[in-house]
Amino acid sequence: MKIKMLFLSFASLVLPSCSSVQTVGGAGMIMNYGSTMEGRSADIRTITFPSGKRMIYGLTVTGGRKPNWRHAVGTTEGMSGDTRGIPEWLDFEWREPSYPGLKMKDFPSDEAYSKAVSEKYSKLTTKTQRVFIKSRIPPEVVHEAIESRLHVQKGQGLPEKSLWIYFIWTDDGIKFRWDLYCTKPCVTKEGGDEVD
């Protein structure tokens, strides 16, 4: 829980302009990218919003099979970290290089290393997938997140309930999960795809 709280504190401060929908009183959300792929990473190139806004990414989610997707190494960030709305869907574009990848120490020079990396990436297939979000989260869960956010006094800090969104790269593509995270004891609410 301490780790998640640290992520939450950090994520609420970053990427304040990611969402293409400025909805007053929106739920906002925190995004986590993870991977259960073994021997491959997910090199995220772009994320496109329903509005057509396209974000260029340089984010790589490392591979490695874990007993549970929640234990997979991931990256957490704020997506609509303030009061913005939840997008209907997001289009992801990524490549899957081998993991671990090339190491600079194995090459005679930086130039040789850069050339090898460029050649390796040029041969990779670019994959795409649309992940639906808003329709898969129960309205009452979104309402709880909104209500919790509205009750936060200025300068008080984080709301008691926050919506977390998970994108997990698997051998079968991107899986989607969500949960309503509580800073105090509450009934666990979560849903989405089954992830082996």
Positions of the model-derived regions?
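Mature extracytoplasmic domains of secretory-pathway proteins
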Residues: 79-143
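Short, surface-exposed beta-strand/loop "edge" segments at domain boundaries and coil↔beta transitions
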Residues: 39-44, 100-103, 174-176
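Compositionally biased low-complexity segments at domain edges in trafficked proteins
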Residues: 119-196
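Bacterial N-terminal signal peptides that target proteins for export
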Residues: 1-7
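Tryptophan-paired
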Residues: 47-99
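C-terminal motif of bacterial Sec signal peptides marking the signal peptidase cleavage site
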Residues: 16-17
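Short, surface-exposed binding/anchoring microloops in extracellular/periplasmic proteins
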Residues: 22-53
